[in-house]
Curated annotation (Swiss-Prot):
Location of the protein in the cell: Cytoplasm
InterPro entries from the UniProt entry: Aa-tRNA-synt_II, aa-tRNA-synth_II, aa-tRNA-synth_II/BPL/LPL, Lys-tRNA-ligase_II, Lys-tRNA-ligase_II_N, Lys-tRNA-synth_II_C, NA-bd_OB-fold, NA-bd_OB_tRNA
Gene from which the chain derives: lysS
Name the record gives this protein: Lysine--tRNA ligase
One biological process term in Gene Ontology: lysyl-tRNA aminoacylation
Top-level taxonomic group: Bacteria
Residues engaged in binding Mg(2+) 1: E410, E417
GO CC aspect terms: cytosol
The entry's keywords: Aminoacyl-tRNA synthetase, ATP-binding, Cytoplasm, Ligase, Magnesium, Metal-binding, Nucleotide-binding, Protein biosynthesis
Organism the protein comes from: Pseudomonas putida (strain W619)
Length: 500
């Protein structure tokens, strides 16, 4: 342990020495004049040049003498050649000691890895076939005071990668790729819905009554109004108010906040897509979701087969559709339908499975507890799990044939919930009764039970058309498409405990 501590202290001392040297160099730049100039305008990106001129030979480039202006961070320094990196990729720049002024050559010798430079020159190709910029002018734009991670080991400490994402992005192409994919996914989802006549909207992040999901909220205080407010746990009730108002197809991509545990699948602040369409039901949403997921896989991976860890999920095949009840029996053949239909036996099964049983739960709630403990983690390939009991679905429409369950599904892939959807409850009186039942659950000790929202009931009293709604966790979806093991890998700045 003491050896590790000594090594850490030595590394810290070495870093402090390097920082001090860089600060001396910055002081020298300040003496010359403006140390952080902002008058350079590039006309090209590094990787765009690599793609555009990939077929040009050394002789063709020499004859064309194509002028370019590039800028980026120095990632490698090989003496005469430096490698710079911008948002698109990398390119080499050549320090020609025969043509560059002595003053410039002297300045180049003082530059360090991590410094940001501007380079002007013409494109050329090396004997090895590498494209580079033969510089006619180069200057320092930003002095980096902290050294980059060691080039051989990189930034490998996972926690440091999350805490210092800016460094992670500089040195890890895999990280940059993940967040480019995330942006691509969100952009395509937006286009997918807009092309189908959905209207993008924004609803309150600060709410007086947290609703739309079973979760524990973050509470804050509005000083001017002297009242408690909550960061939203879901936008659902506001989006359905918009459907009542006549916006029949709406969606929102935004943040939700839940004051709950942190894990590889949970972050207190996360991104959700929620969409609602009138004159549709939950089966329409299943079809729409399959279509969307296939398009996203094809867009990102060029295939509907999605590799994740040591598994491959097949988005090109029809997603399995099973009820909660049937899935328990399928994946637990030792159980019988009679076991699940008797409240005392179901309670015993839930307890033995490890569920937190309080004792007041109804049969439907116990069935869901059994499902969560004994089935959920087994759902590897895409599964739509349907017909959730109404006790755990206070906002969903009851099934016409079996009023004990609702027209609802959750989508599971790799044992994780990715989406939740249902045919919306639009009976104002039924909704009021279910809110009252949720209040009773909360009074009995269920912190995640919903509050009574009188204004939402009033909105339903004006009449909401038959509607289907859905929420999709963007972070978990991006995890799948980028083969990322932790939700922190797909959130730029995940929540972390403060460093000691």
């Amino acid at each position: 342990m003491s050896d590790l501590k000594t090594e850490s202290q030595d590394l810290q001392q070495e870093e402090n020495t390097l920082i001090a040297l860089r600060k001396e160099k910055l002081a020298a730049e300040r003496e010359k004049g403006q140390a952080f100039p902002n008058d350079f305008r590039r006309d090209s990106y590094c990787n765009d040049l690599q793609k555009q001129y990939v077929d040009k030979t050394k002789e063709e480039l020499e004859a064309a003498a194509i002028p370019v202006k590039v800028a980026g961070r120095i990632m490698l320094n090989r003496g005469s050649f430096m490698v710079i990196q911008d948002m698109t990729g990398r390119i080499q720049v050549y320090v020609n000691r025969k043509t560059l002024p002595e003053e410039t050559l002297a300045a180049v010798k003082t530059w360090d890895l991590g410094d940001i430079i501007a380079a002007e020159g013409t494109l050329a190709r090396s004997g090895k076939g590498d494209l580079y910029v033969e510089m006619t002018n180069v200057r320092l734009l930003t002095k980096s005071l902290r050294p980059l991670p060691d080039k051989h080991h990189g930034l490998t400490d996972t926690e440091q990668r999350y805490r210092q994402r800016y460094v992670d992005l500089m040195v890890n192409e895999e990280t940059r790729h993940t967040f480019r994919v995330r942006s691509q996914v969100i952009s395509h989802i937006r286009k997918f819905l807009i092309d189908r006549d959905f209207l993008e909207v924004e609803t309150p992040m600060l709410q007086t009554i947290p609703g739309g999901a079973a979760a524990k909220p973050f509470e804050t205080h509005h000083n001017a109004l002297d009242m408690a407010m909550f960061l939203r746990i879901a936008p659902e009730l506001y989006l359905k108010r918009l459907v009542v108002g006549g916006f029949e197809k709406v969606f929102e991509i935004n943040r939700n906040f839940r004051n709950e545990g942190v894990s590889t699948r949970h972050n207190p602040e996360f991104t959700m897509l929620e969409f609602y369409q009138a004159y549709a039901d939950y089966r329409d949403n299943m079809d729409l979701t399959e279509e969307l997921f296939r398009e996203l896989a094809q867009l990102v991976l060029g295939s509907t087969d999605v590799p994740y860890g040591d598994k491959v999920f097949h988005f090109g095949e029809p997603f399995v559709r099973l009820s909660v009840f049937d899935s328990i029996l399928k994946y637990n053949p030792e159980l019988t339908a009679a076991d699940l239909q008797d409240v005392d036996r179901a309670r015993d099964i839930a307890k033995k499975a490890g569920a937190k049983v309080l004792g007041h739960e109804g049969l439907g709630k116990l069935q869901v507890m059994i499902f969560e403990e004994l089935v959920e983690h087994k759902l590897e390939q895409p599964h739509f799990i349907t017909e959730y009991p109404f006790e755990v679905s206070p906002l969903a429409r009851r099934n016409d044939d079996n009023p004990a369950v609702t027209d609802r599904f959750e989508l599971f892939i790799g044992g994780r919930e990715i989406a939740n959807a249902y045919s919306e409850l639009n009976d104002a009186e039924d909704q009021a009764e279910r809110f009252l039942a949720q209040v009773a659950e909360k009074d009995a000790g269920d912190d995640e039970a919903m509050h009574y929202d009188a204004d939402f009931v009033r909105a339903l009293e004006y009449g909401m058309p038959p509607t289907a709604g859905e929420g999709i966790g963007i972070d978990r979806l991006v995890m799948l498409l980028t083969n990322s093991p932790s939700i922190r890998d797909v959130i730029l700045f995940p929540h972390m405990r403060p460093q000691a």
